[in-house]
């Protein structure tokens, strides 16, 4: 077998680190709300180099709040992570892969968890729009010092 030097991304694990669903006033929020609620979504990416060679944990921390007339209807917090092994990838490319490609791989799972959680909470399933991580990182780097961090906080409010 010949050793290859081709770039490779391997997903070693995916998991929920934290999941919380709050429905502070279910009687009123499920039966007495007549207006469409305002949905606010915040997303944070955390990247941690693990002790194993070329292994990284990429974590998406998502908070979704629904309010109507300044009253909280529900709040969801999901922290979902993946362990990725990057092989034969330059340091410059690693930053892009870890802050864009890896979040793109795990985001659909976060979206599904949010949808299922709202539905199990008695609401219609909330489908978060697709997120263009490359555009967000590009915008963050043009407004901030790109050397500072690859851990920006994003406002990706749903436009429903």
From Swiss-Prot:
What GO CC terms are in its UniProt record? cytoplasm
Instruction: Give compartment(s).
Output: Cytoplasm
> In the record, what terms sit under GO molecular function?
unfolded protein binding
Keywords, in A-Z order: Chaperone, Cytoplasm, Protein transport, Translocation, Transport
Q: Name one GO biological process term.
A: protein transport
Q: What does this protein do?
A: One of the proteins required for the normal export of preproteins out of the cell cytoplasm. It is a molecular chaperone that binds to a subset of precursor proteins, maintaining them in a translocation-competent state. It also specifically binds to its receptor SecA.
Q: Which family does it belong to?
A: Belongs to the SecB family.
NCBIfam families per record = PRK05751.1-3, secB
Quaternary structure and partners: Homotetramer, a dimer of dimers. One homotetramer interacts with 1 SecA dimer.
Protein's name according to its UniProt entry:
Protein-export protein SecB
Q: Which organism is it from?
A: Orientia tsutsugamushi (strain Boryong) (Rickettsia tsutsugamushi)
